[in-house]
Amino acid sequence: MKRLFWNLKHKKAWLVLLLGTGMILSSCSNIDQSFFRELSVESVEKNTAYNQLPVNSTTFRNLVFGTRSYNDGNYVVVIATETDSSQINFLNGSTNQGTSSLSWGGTLGTTIRQVQNRYSTYPNGVKFLIWNDIAPGSVKWNPYARFPVVDRKNELASQEDKDNSNKLRRSDASAVRYREIVDFIQRTYGGNVANLINQSNVHAQTVGNDVTKAIVIAFRKDNLNKIRANFYGLDNSTNPNAPGSGQGDSTPPASSGEGGGSDGSSGGDSSSGNGQNTTPTSPQSSQPAVQRSQKSYGIKQHAVRVSVDFLNFLDSVYTPLN
């Protein structure tokens, strides 16, 4: 009898361990996948549909850390969702939802045309990569949108409303990926991106409310072979080194948080800026403090502006030679 209980106890322990491991793997599943699409001048001019853009082979983890394996470290990463009106405008120049086939008539496409031959000091110019959250169905809720908070003692509320109280509205693969992306960027760059989510609109009942902002990170390799990460909408006077630019080997941070999940995982490659696994153990503490721009980082003053402002931002990143 004792042996039977011993076996059951240890089988249960192994089951818990396996389940826990599965949870960790699923929470990081999207981070080591390759899903960003290359947006070129040719694609903009031909109005190539988003889902027809070529997928780049670099993993999301390495792109966010800053890697010289892609265009020698000189590239712009754009993360957006079709669920927020300001982000739709940034991409295609309108505020209409349901933009799975983007026209690239907004600030992003206009600026890509303008910089085609602008940065001649870079042999291959500056490359643009984009991933866009596309909500299934006709109702376009932001990946962070939640159901209203309902008191379970409220006799006027339906049981369905009580059951859904404060839960995330979306659990589709695109929403899960979007939340993992934002979570990973926040963990990697800490306070620099603390206000990506507008908490006051998370429970908004109007589809299209701006819950998150378009995330634009411009990476540049300087003359010391360090890759700098520059956030559009921030005061970039103190550009932090990207985690992949020569900060030594360390253990990757776990990406967790509500809304994480798995739609499959590839191992990805472990190389970042200096050809080694240079993920910081404590990404928030490894980055120097960056002062937020009062005029550009509030949710009401979107990171989406007229194209000349975005062009000025890119000029400030890629024109310096130091």
From Swiss-Prot:
Lipidation (S-diacylglycerol cysteine): C28
Lipid-acceptor residues (N-palmitoyl cysteine): C28
Protein name (record): Uncharacterized lipoprotein MG348
Keyword Membrane: yes
Annotated signal peptide: 1-27
InterPro entries: DUF6856
Membrane topology: Lipid-anchor
Record's keyword terms, sorted: Cell membrane, Lipoprotein, Membrane, Palmitate, Signal
Residue ranges, compositional bias (Gly residues): 257-267
Biased composition (Polar residues): 235-254, 274-296
CC per GO annotation: plasma membrane
Subcellular locations according to the entry: Cell membrane
Principal subcellular localisation of the protein: membrane
Region (Disordered): 235-298
